[in-house]
Amino acid sequence: MEADVMHAPAAEVGRSRTLLIGSALAAASTLMLFAGLFGVYISIRQNNEYLIENQLDGGMLWFPDLAVQIAPGTMMMFTTWISAFTMAWAVQAIRNDDRRNAYVALGLTILMGAAVINQMVFAITDFGVPIDRSVPSLLLYTLYGAYIAFLAIAIIFVLLMGIRALAGQFDSTNADGIEAAAIIWFTAVIVYLPLWYLITITK
């Protein structure tokens, strides 16, 4: 009996969840950053509306007529939603050891992210107002620039996790890398919704 106990296999060491925890912390930090930027934007805009309504000095036209088009911003929103589904597809595929579909889903996710960046650069170019022309234009460039930077980081992260998946580091027993990439990607999708509403809808 004692011999059986002595030769019993050691308990399996639990996997480190460092990548998932780090990604969750990065996502939380990003949400706080954009919440601060949105707060500044809303505060300055409400103050501007107060000045205009009360005919006080300092009020200004927020954006020139037709400077911000609804179609490009809305198209970007739908593109981010589609990318959320492809990212979720990648996670499910790697959990099922369906590597082919995982690679396809990751590739489509990266493609969607690149499309959003392209659309956003087009929207900025189409805006046609220099960054130093007014406070509203500065805020618009700041919000769009911050989002482009974060989305670019998310694309690189998904690409790196995809390369690791190609190397065989992730499977049904260890999908942490793809799940971590999904956390960052879903954060980018969530952040765009208030950005779309503030810039495209309320203008």
What are these model-predicted stretches?
Residues 1-203:
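...captures the hydrophobic TM-helix bundle architecture rather than a specific catalytic motif
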